[in-house]
Amino acid sequence: EDLRNVTPPKVSLFEPSKAEIANKQKATLVCLARGFFPDHVELSWWVNGKEVHSGVSTDPQAYKESNYSYCLSSRLRVSATFWHNPRNHFRCQVQFHGLSEEDKWPEGSPKPVTQNISAEAWGRADCGITSASYQQGVLSATILYEILLGKATLYAVLVSTLVVMAMVKRKNS
């Protein structure tokens, strides 16, 4: 193999189609690694920081695009409900086995060494809620809960004070 043509992949992650989600209640994420040479790559899926194997379908081998370029695709299928949770984080990771430290490489250009290249996406809420707006909603709900709890505590103290005052007044009369 010609070491001068060693090139790491460009990795893209495509989100599931709305039609698939609506019709099948499933969500398929597609990972595409392309433009790499040689074809020494390993592709893995990670969900919420943990590697997953269930629901994964990866091409059996990299396809040759041209003399010095390969591509590889993989799919991860999850339930529509799981995809619609904005807290779920999906990552496609491609480990590219490039040059070793001993391999000769021309000065002035970056040496394509073994490296991990990733693309990622967050789950999308069904009603257009993003992760940031979801977190803002949780924060607002927490603040509202604390205000209501404070009001209830204040009301309990006020009622208790009135009851004690009534008992003292009754005892004195």
Curated annotation (Swiss-Prot):
It is a single-pass membrane protein. Glycans are attached at N67, N116. Gene3D superfamilies: Immunoglobulins. The keyword Membrane applies. Disulfide bonds join C31-C71. The keyword Chloroplast does not apply. CDD domains: IgC1_TCR_beta. Residues 168-173 are cytoplasmic. It comes from the Eukaryota. The chain crosses the membrane at residues 146-167. It is found in: Membrane. Keywords: Disulfide bond, Glycoprotein, Immunoglobulin domain, Membrane, Receptor, Transmembrane, Transmembrane helix. Residues 1-146 are annotated as: C region. GO terms for cellular component: alpha-beta T cell receptor complex. Clone B10.A was isolated from a cytotoxic T lymphocyte. Clone 86T1 was isolated from a cytotoxic T lymphocyte. This is T-cell receptor beta-1 chain C region. It comes from Mus musculus. The lineage of its organism: Eukaryota, Metazoa, Chordata, Craniata, Vertebrata.
